[in-house]
């Protein structure tokens, strides 16, 4: 018995030891798994952080590229502007060079003329036969000169305008103007002043000044806001008038609505109408309107005309011949035509009659 009990105890102990060993192994495996998972999480975090950094760098690079593109566009625009300005400068330099050439040619011509004048002056100085006239702004030059020659005691003729032989050539001498020349000059000055006053430029300036004054007065009297309101109200009135005209044109009745079918009465009425046609023409022109009998007929437009006696007689004969051939139906109700006379204000003639007679 003791041996069995001891063996059982040993078995129980062994089972316990095996269970403890298995638990320890499982615990170690779980710890290793947790450690591995922690490492993986840290690696993933580092990867995500690196990705974020890379994205930020990419954004910075994109911004830098955009700025570079903008600067390149600006440089291209500046280059185009500079090329345009350079072309203009080249054109101006060409023009200046052409002008410089012209100026050089003119200067050369003037220098040649100056040389010629100097040579002539030298010749005149050598001969001592020259006279100098100095122009002054205050004293105007005369338009005409009158030279009076006097005979000297020696018998030689001398001019009053020329200085004596003893005077030097540099001295000045005055010339008296005639009264007619002065009057002519004053008249020409007045004419020139009048021309300047009534020239195109002066007239344009006066027009501009007058227009500016008128505009100022307009702005003082009527403000621009009020002027805009008046313009808007005028446009509204125009649009409303057009709409009213369109509505009237749409609502206006047609010519077919004004036509009336009137029944014939008989031979007696036709004969009476044929005989008394001339009288009815005169009476119809005097009567402006007649009352309608039927309720359906509301409005008719009838135009009356003067007829000659011959035409009335011919119409009456034609009606009699037509009604002899066809039997005249007896009307149940007599309907009188509604007549409305429209007289022209300008002409004194009686207007035409438009009556449709139908069975």
From Swiss-Prot:
- Name of a matching Pfam family: PTRF_SDPR
Report the protein name in the record.
Caveolae-associated protein 4
Q: Where is this region: Disordered?
A: 155-184, 227-359
Name of the gene encoding the protein in the UniProt record:
cavin4
* Annotated coiled-coil segments of the chain: 45-129
Extract the PANTHER family matched here: CAVEOLAE-ASSOCIATED PROTEIN 4 (PTHR15240:SF4), CAVIN (PTHR15240)
Is the keyword Cytoplasm assigned to this protein?
A: yes
Query: Which species does this protein come from?
Result: Xenopus laevis
Q: Where is the composition biased (Basic and acidic residues)?
A: 227-245, 323-347
User: Can you cite an annotated GO cellular component?
Assistant: plasma membrane
Spell out the subcellular localization from the entry: Cytoplasm, Myofibril, Sarcomere; Cytoplasm; Membrane, Caveola
Q: An example of a Gene Ontology BP annotation on this entry? A: muscle organ development
Q: Which family does it belong to?
A: Belongs to the CAVIN family.
| UniProt keywords, alphabetically | Activator, Coiled coil, Cytoplasm, Developmental protein, Differentiation, Membrane, Myogenesis, Transcription, Transcription regulation
Q: What is the protein's known function? A: Induces rhoa activation and activates nppa transcription and myofibrillar organization through the rho/rock signaling pathway.
């Amino acid at each position: 018995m003791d041996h069995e009990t001891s063996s059982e105890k040993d078995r129980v102990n062994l089972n316990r030891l095996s269970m403890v060993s298995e638990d320890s192994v499982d615990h170690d495996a779980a710890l290793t798994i947790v450690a591995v998972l922690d490492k993986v999480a840290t690696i993933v975090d580092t990867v995500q952080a690196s990705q974020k950094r890379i994205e930020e760098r990419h954004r910075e690079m994109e911004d830098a590229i955009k700025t570079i593109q903008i600067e390149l566009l600006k440089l291209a625009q500046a280059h185009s502007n500079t090329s345009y300005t350079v072309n203009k400068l080249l054109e101006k330099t060409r023009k200046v060079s052409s002008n410089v050439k012209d100026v050089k040619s003119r200067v050369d011509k003037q220098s040649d003329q100056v040389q010629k004048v100097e040579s002539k002056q030298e010749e005149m100085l050598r001969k001592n036969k020259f006279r100098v006239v100095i122009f002054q702004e205050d004293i105007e030059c005369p338009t005409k000169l009158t030279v009076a020659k006097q005979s000297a005691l020696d018998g030689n003729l001398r001019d009053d305008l020329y200085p004596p032989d003893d005077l030097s050539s540099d001295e000045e001498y005055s010339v008296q103007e005639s009264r007619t020349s002065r009057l002519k000059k004053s008249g020409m000055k007045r004419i020139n002043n009048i021309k300047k006053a009534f020239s195109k430029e002066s007239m344009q300036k006066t027009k501009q000044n007058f227009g500016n004054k008128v505009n100022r007065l307009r702005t003082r009297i009527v403000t621009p806001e009020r002027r805009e309101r008046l313009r808007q109200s005028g446009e509204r009135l125009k649009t409303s008038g057009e709409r009213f005209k369109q509505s009237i044109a749409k609502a206006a009745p047609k010519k077919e609505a004004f036509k009336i079918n009137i029944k014939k009465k008989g031979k007696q009425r036709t004969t009476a109408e044929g005989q008394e046609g001339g009288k009815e023409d005169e009476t119809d022109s005097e009567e402006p309107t007649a009352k309608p009998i039927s309720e359906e007929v509301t409005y008719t437009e009838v135009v009356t005309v003067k007829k000659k006696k011959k035409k009335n007689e011919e119409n009456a004969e034609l009606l009699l011949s037509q009604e002899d051939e066809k039997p005249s139906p007896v009307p149940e109700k007599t309907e009188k035509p509604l007549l409305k006379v429209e007289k022209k204000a300008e002409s004194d003639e009686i207007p035409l009659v438009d009556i449709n007679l139908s069975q």
